C-alpha cells in the first residue's frame, strides 16, 4: 500500500481547487463580466447563443490552454531540476525554449502562420538545441555545471540569431513575431490548439510513465545503474520529453519564462516533500500561469498585457527573494 502524507494530499487538493476557482474566474472575466450562474448555463448550452459563444469559443480555450501550458512548463522544469540536481536547471536558463522560439521564427519567415509548421519547427528547434548542448557538454559523461554553462552560452547565440531573423523578416511577420515573443495567450481559439495541445497531453503521459526512472536517477548514477536503469539513455529520454513539452508550449503561446523555474520550487515549499513532484509541479505551473494571465487581463484594463511580461516580473521577484533567503542561511 502506498502511503501518502496528509499534508501532501491536502496540498494537491488545494491546488486543484485553486485551479478550478481561477478557471471559473477566468470564464467570468473580460470586457463583459458574467455571473457564475451564467457561465455554467453557457457551458451546459442553456444560455443565449451570444453568451455561449463568448464563454465556449473565446474564454474557455484560453483558460484551458493556460492550465495545460502551465502544467507542461511546470513538469518540464521539475524534470530538468531533477536531472541536473540543480535548482537553476530549467529550459529557460538552458536556452531550450529559446531554441524552440528560433524554430517558430524560421517557420514564420518561411511558411507564414501555418500552425502545423510552427509546432513542428518549434519542436525541431528545441530538440536540435538540446542535442547541441548535450554534445558540447559531453566529456565521458555529463557534468551538471558544464551543461548549464554551455546552455547559457548557446542561449545567448540563439538570441542573436533570433534578432537577425527579425531584422530580415517582413514588417508584418516581425510585428507578429514580436508580440508572440513576449509570451501571450491573446487570441487563442480551439482551431489554434492543434497540433500542440495533443502533443503536450501525450508528453505529460510519457513523463508520468518515466517517474520511477527519475526517482532512481535522483538516488545517484551508481545506485540507478545497480538497480537496472540505463542511466544515460534514461536521462536523454527524460530530457527529450521535457524539451518537447517546452517546445509545444512555446508553439502555442511563445516563450513564457520563469514558470518552469519557479513552479517546482513552490511545489516543494508548500508540500514539504518531493514526492509526487511532477504532479505538484504541474498543478503549481497551471495555477501560476492562469493567475498571471488573469492579472495581465485585469490589472490594466482596457489594455491587456502579454502574460509573459507578468511571469517575468513575478518570477524575477521570487528569484531575488530565494537568493536572499539562501544567502542568509549561509
Swiss-Prot record:
Gene Ontology cellular component list: ATP-binding cassette (ABC) transporter complex, substrate-binding subunit-containing; membrane; plasma membrane
Keyword Transcription regulation: no
Membrane topology term: Multi-pass membrane protein
UniProt cross-references to NCBIfam families, sorted A to Z: PRK10440.1
Induction profile: Controlled in part by the amount of available iron. Induced 1.4-fold by hydroxyurea.
Residues in compartment: Cytoplasmic: 29-62, 114-117, 168-190, 257-275, 325-330
The protein, known as: Ferric enterobactin transport system permease protein FepG
GO molecular function, one term: ferric-enterobactin transmembrane transporter activity
Pfam families: FecCD
Any GO BP annotation: iron import into cell
Complex formation: The complex is composed of two ATP-binding proteins (FepC), two transmembrane proteins (FepD and FepG) and a solute-binding protein (FepB).
Segments crossing the lipid bilayer: 8-28, 63-83, 93-113, 118-138, 147-167, 191-211, 236-256, 276-296, 304-324
Positions in the Periplasmic compartment: 1-7, 84-92, 139-146, 212-235, 297-303
InterPro entries assigned to the protein according to its UniProt record, in alphabetical order: ABC_BtuC-like, ABC_transptr_permease_BtuC
Family indicated by similarity: Belongs to the binding-protein-dependent transport system permease family. FecCD subfamily.
Annotated keywords: Cell inner membrane, Cell membrane, Ion transport, Iron, Iron transport, Membrane, Transmembrane, Transmembrane helix, Transport
Function: Part of the ABC transporter complex FepBDGC involved in ferric enterobactin uptake. Responsible for the translocation of the substrate across the membrane.
Places the protein is found: Cell inner membrane
PANTHER family with a match to the protein in the record: FERRIC ENTEROBACTIN TRANSPORT SYSTEM PERMEASE PROTEIN, FERRIC ENTEROBACTIN TRANSPORT SYSTEM PERMEASE PROTEIN FEPG
Amino acid at each position: 500500500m502506498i502511503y501518502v502524507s496528509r499534508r501532501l494530499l491536502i496540498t494537491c487538493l488545494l491546488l486543484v481547487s485553486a485551479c478550478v476557482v481561477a478557471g471559473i474566474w477566468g470564464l467570468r472575466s473580460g470586457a463583459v463580466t458574467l455571473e457564475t450562474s451564467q457561465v455554467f448555463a453557457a457551458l451546459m448550452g442553456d444560455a443565449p447563443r451570444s453568451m455561449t459563444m463568448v464563454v465556449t469559443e473565446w474564454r474557455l480555450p484560453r483558460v484551458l490552454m493556460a492550465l495545460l501550458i502551465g502544467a507542461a512548463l511546470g513538469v518540464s522544469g521539475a524534470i530538468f531540476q531533477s536531472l541536473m540536481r540543480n535548482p537553476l536547471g530549467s529550459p529557460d536558463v538552458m536556452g531550450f525554449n529559446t531554441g524552440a522560439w528560433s524554430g517558430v521564427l524560421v517557420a514564420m519567415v518561411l511558411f507564414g502562420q501555418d500552425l502545423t509548421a510552427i509546432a513542428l519547427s518549434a519542436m525541431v528547434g528545441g530538440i536540435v538545441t538540446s542535442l547541441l548542448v548535450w554534445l558540447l557538454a559531453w566529456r565521458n559523461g555529463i557534468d551538471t555545471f558544464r551543461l548549464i554553462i554551455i546552455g547559457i552560452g548557446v542561449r545567448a547565440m540563439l538570441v542573436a540569431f533570433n534578432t537577425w531573423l527579425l531584422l530580415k523578416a517582413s514588417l508584418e511577420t516581425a510585428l507578429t513575431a514580436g508580440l508572440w515573443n513576449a509570451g501571450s495567450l491573446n487570441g487563442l481559439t480551439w482551431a489554434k490548439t492543434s497540433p500542440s495541445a495533443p502533443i503536450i497531453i501525450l508528453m505529460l503521459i510519457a513523463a508520468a510513465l518515466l517517474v520511477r526512472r527519475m526517482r532512481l536517477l535522483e538516488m545517484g548514477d551508481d545506485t540507478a545503474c545497480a538497480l537496472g536503469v540505463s542511466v544515460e539513455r534514461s536521462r536523454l529520454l527524460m530530457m527529450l520529453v521535457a524539451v518537447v513539452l517546452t517546445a509545444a508550449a512555446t508553439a502555442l503561446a511563445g516563450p513564457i519564462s520563469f514558470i518552469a523555474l519557479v513552479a517546482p520550487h513552490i511545489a516543494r515549499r508548500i508540500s514539504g516533500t518531493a514526492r509526487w513532484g511532477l504532479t505538484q509541479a504541474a498543478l503549481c505551473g497551471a495555477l501560476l500561469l492562469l493567475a498571471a494571465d488573469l492579472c495581465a487581463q485585469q490589472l490594466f484594463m482596457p489594455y491587456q498585457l502579454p502574460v509573459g511580461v507578468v511571469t517575468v516580473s513575478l518570477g524575477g521577484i521570487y528569484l531575488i527573494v530565494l537568493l536572499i533567503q539562501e544567502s542568509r542561511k549561509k
